[in-house]
Regions:
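Extracytoplasmic
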Residues: 59-61, 79-81, 112, 128, ...
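Conserved redox-active cysteine motifs that mediate thiol-disulfide chemistry
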Residues: 80, 88-105
């Protein structure tokens, strides 16, 4: 009887965990193409973008809520169908300030219907300060996005994708991570442009994700 109970218990546990496996995160499964893209662009992660950590496991980037320059609510989901270089920055972050011209230049060179640099400012106090800073350094190609609550950083931190500033993620057309960068980079350098161009042109990343 005890042996039979043990067998039944194992069967029940196996059934439960089997169901769990069958119901594994569909978003993660849909992000497999982004991992393939990461593998494809990995040989280009050198020189000025050598610190880019390419995705080895599927990860759907949180939707993230922020605002545009007019104060309209936006989420990262608005960019489904586009490859995105997502960057979190602040005026109090010296490396962020130094990186902004390169991000602006990358948007000038590659920005269009297939790609955008989405740089989100997370200053929590004076909302005019980052705008004045961007004007002072001559940034003209980046669209201004902000989150004065800094929740976008906290969400990425909880997901293990943000540890400091600046934080940058390359996100594919389905909202899945291709790679992440902790710290600044010369994104408009030949190394950066070549890598991002390869990510944009990748045939992967067309899986439909509804969440």
């Amino acid at each position: 009887m005890l042996a039979l109970c043990g067998i039944l218990a194992l069967a029940v546990l196996g059934g439960v965990y089997g169901i769990g496996r069958l119901r594994s995160n569909p978003a993660a499964a849909a992000c497999e193409p982004a991992v393939a893209t990461a593998g494809r662009v990995a040989p280009l992660a050198h020189g000025e973008v050598a610190a880019l950590a390419l995705a080895h496991t599927p990860f759907l980037v949180p939707v993230l809520a922020f605002k545009d320059a007019e104060g309209h609510a936006r989420t990262l989901k608005d960019w489904r169908g586009h490859t995105v270089l997502l960057n979190l920055w602040a005026t109090w972050c010296v490396p962020c300030r130094k990186e902004m011209p390169a991000l602006d230049a990358l948007q000038r060179e590659l920005g269009g219907p297939k790609f955008e640099v989405v740089a989100i400012n997370i200053d929590t106090r004076d909302p005019e300060k980052p705008l004045a800073f961007l004007k002072d350094i001559g940034v003209t190609h980046l669209t201004y996005y902000s989150d004065q609550s800094a929740k976008v950083f906290q969400e990425l931190k909880l997901a293990g994708k943000a540890f400091g500033m600046p934080t940058t993620l390359i996100v594919d057309r389905s909202g899945c991570e291709i790679g992440e960068m902790a710290g600044p980079a010369e994104w408009a350098s030949p190394d950066g442009v070549k890598l991002v161009s390869a990510a944009i042109s990748s045939p992967d990343g067309a899986s439909a994700i509804t969440q």
